[in-house]
From Swiss-Prot:
One of its GO terms (cellular component) is cytosol. This is RNA chaperone ProQ. It comes from Shewanella piezotolerans (strain WP3 / JCM 13877). Belongs to the ProQ family. Residues 114-149 are annotated as: Disordered. Gene3D superfamilies: ProQ/FinO domain (1.10.1710.10). SUPFAM superfamilies: FinO-like. It comes from the Bacteria. One of its GO terms (biological process) is post-transcriptional regulation of gene expression.
Amino acid sequence: MESTEKLTDTNAILAYLYETFPLCFIAEGETKPLKIGLFQDLAERLADDSKVSKTQLRIALRRYTSSWRYLKCVKAGTHRIDLDGNSCGELEQEHVDHAQATLKESQEKAKAKRIAKAGKTSAPAANAKKPVKKPVARRPKAAPSAKPVKEKVAEVVLTPAVLTELKKNQRVNVKLGKAPVAGVILDIKKEDVQVQLDSGLTIKVKAEYILL
């Protein structure tokens, strides 16, 4: 019996999704916002496919929906689509605002990294020995006018939630990886809390992973 090799690389899984669901996952160009709860549909469609696991699918879907290309397509008046490319309703303004804020933050971080990298590269050249020049007499410059001090914005500190403080339809943040992800509580069963993320994913986590 021929065994099927399981895909583990996220890029390979995305390529597989592009090929399997071309009307939903767009490989190049402008993408379209995905249906809320699409992960469940995806898991059901690929339940008998031994190439991919639910965990790897979730990671690949998160990569797809957090890319700049995807976030740029989340704008007012746009409709979400299902696995077959069918329209599933217009985007809510709250989701549009969150996507644009996430995009802006991601682009600013990337810009800061580029500047920091450029600074490290130019530092050795700046420290190189320069020829000594004779001092040139200069006219005294007028004292520069004081620049207005920018007011620092207080950083929002998120703290772990207590299960008894949580309720349905409450806006929360879920600790996933390095940065918390915003979402809405759909249901609470015992110690498990079901949260619908703004990207469309629906996950189930313990209260300790929810931040307020």
